[in-house]
C-alpha cells in the first residue's frame, strides 16, 4: 500500500516536472511511508521525507526514533540525525536538493527552520509546491482506506452510544467523556486484533472531549468539565478529533436532551439544523462542486432567519482537515 503511493507520487512528480519533493507534514509522511509515533516539531525535531522522482527516497529522522523508523518506514534509506552532532538534520539536504532543478515543498506544513535552510540552498524561483499533488492523491480513497473509514465509523458509533447512555440528570460532564473514551478504545482494540497486523498501533482514544451542556451549549468547542447536567438541558457531544482509528479520522457530532426539552425553542433550532443537513445530503452527488453542497445547506439556514453559517463539512482521511472542504470557494468536483 505505501509502496504503491510512493510510486504514484514519483509518477506525478515526473509528470509535473518536479525533481524532488520535501515532505514534512506528519500525515503525509505516514500516508507515503507508514512511519508514525515519532516526536514532532513541538520538540524541535524535524523529520523530513525526501522523494526524488527517479532516485531513492530518504527519510531524515532523529536517532532517538531510529528503531521505530526501521520497523515502520517503507523507504529506500533512513538518515538518522542527533542533537549536536555535525549538521544534524541539515546534513543530507544539500546533496539531495542541489541535484534538483525544481524542488517542491509543502508551504503550509513545513517548519520555518527547515524552510529557511532550504532557501539558503536554492533560489526561490526553483521552489514550487507539492501540496496539490498530494491532496489529489489523498482525495481518492483506496479499498484499504475505505475499510479503515468503516471501522472508524464503528468506533465512532460505540463512543456515541456510550456517551448517550452516560448522560443523565445529576451526572458531571467529565463522566460522559470517560465513557466515550473507554468505549472507543475497547471497540478499536477489538477491530485491531480482528483485522490488522500492525501490533504497534494503539487502540486508545485520545483527545480532550468536546462537549457542552445547559447554558454552555453555544460554546462550540467547550470541553468536558465538572459541571453537573440537569433534566431538560441540551447536551452537545462532538467527536471531531476523538474518532481516530488506525490514524483514520472522522468528524461528527450529536445533540441530546435529558428526558425532555425544557426550552421548546431549542427544538425549533435543531429542526433547522436537521433540514440544512438533509439539504446538503440531497445536493451531494457526483458531478457537483463542493461549494454547491455548502450553498444548499446555507440557504436553509439563512432562509430560517439565521446568519450565513460556517462551512458545511470537510473530507475525511488521515488528517483532521482534508480536501475537499464543503465551503464557499472550493470548486472541487
What kind of region is each of these model predictions?
Residues 1-333:
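Active-site neighborhoods and metal-handling regions in enzymes and metal-associated proteins
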Amino acid at each position: 500500500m505505501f509502496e504503491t503511493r510512493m510510486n504514484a507520487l514519483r509518477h506525478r512528480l515526473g509528470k509535473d516536472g518536479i525533481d524532488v519533493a520535501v515532505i514534512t507534514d506528519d500525515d503525509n509522511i505516514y500516508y507515503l511511508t507508514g512511519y508514525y509515533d515519532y516526536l514532532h516539531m513541538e520538540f524541535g525535531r524535524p523529520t523530513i521525507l525526501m522523494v526524488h522522482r527517479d532516485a531513492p527516497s530518504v527519510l531524515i529522522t532523529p536517532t532517538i526514533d531510529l528503531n521505530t523508523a526501521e520497523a515502520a518506514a517503507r523507504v529506500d534509506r533512513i538518515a538518522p540525525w542527533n542533537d549536536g552532532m555535525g549538521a544534524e538534520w541539515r546534513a543530507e539536504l544539500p546533496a539531495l536538493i542541489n541535484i534538483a532543478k525544481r524542488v517542491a515543498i509543502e508551504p503550509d506544513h513545513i517548519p520555518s527552520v527547515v524552510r529557511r535552510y532550504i532557501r539558503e540552498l536554492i533560489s526561490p524561483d526553483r521552489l514550487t509546491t507539492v501540496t496539490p499533488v498530494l491532496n489529489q492523491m489523498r482525495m481518492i480513497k483506496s479499498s484499504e482506506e475505505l475499510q479503515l473509514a468503516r471501522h472508524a465509523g464503528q468506533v465512532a458509533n460505540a463512543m456515541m452510544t456510550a456517551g448517550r447512555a452516560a448522560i443523565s440528570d445529576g451526572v458531571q460532564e467529565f463522566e460522559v467523556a470517560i465513557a466515550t473514551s473507554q468505549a472507543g478504545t475497547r471497540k478499536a482494540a477489538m477491530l485491531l486484533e480482528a483485522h490488522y497486523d500492525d501490533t504497534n498501533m494503539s487502540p486508545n482514544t485520545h483527545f480532550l472531549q468536546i462537549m457542552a451542556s445547559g447554558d454552555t451549549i453555544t460554546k462550540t468547542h467547550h470541553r468536558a468539565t465538572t459541571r453537573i447536567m440537569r433534566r431538560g438541558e441540551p447536551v452537545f457531544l462532538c467527536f471531531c478529533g476523538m474518532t481516530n482509528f488506525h490514524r483514520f479520522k472522522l468528524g461528527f457530532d450529536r445533540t441530546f436532551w435529558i428526558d425532555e426539552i425544557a426550552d421548546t425553542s431549542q427544538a425549533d433550532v435543531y429542526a433547522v439544523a436537521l433540514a440544512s443537513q438533509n439539504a446538503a445530503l440531497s445536493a451531494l452527488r457526483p458531478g457537483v462542486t463542493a461549494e454547491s453542497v455548502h450553498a444548499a445547506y446555507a440557504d436553509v439556514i439563512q432562509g430560517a432567519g439565521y446568519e450565513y453559517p460556517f462551512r458545511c463539512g470537510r473530507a475525511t482521511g488521515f488528517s483532521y482537515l482534508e480536501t475537499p472542504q464543503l465551503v464557499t470557494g472550493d470548486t472541487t468536483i
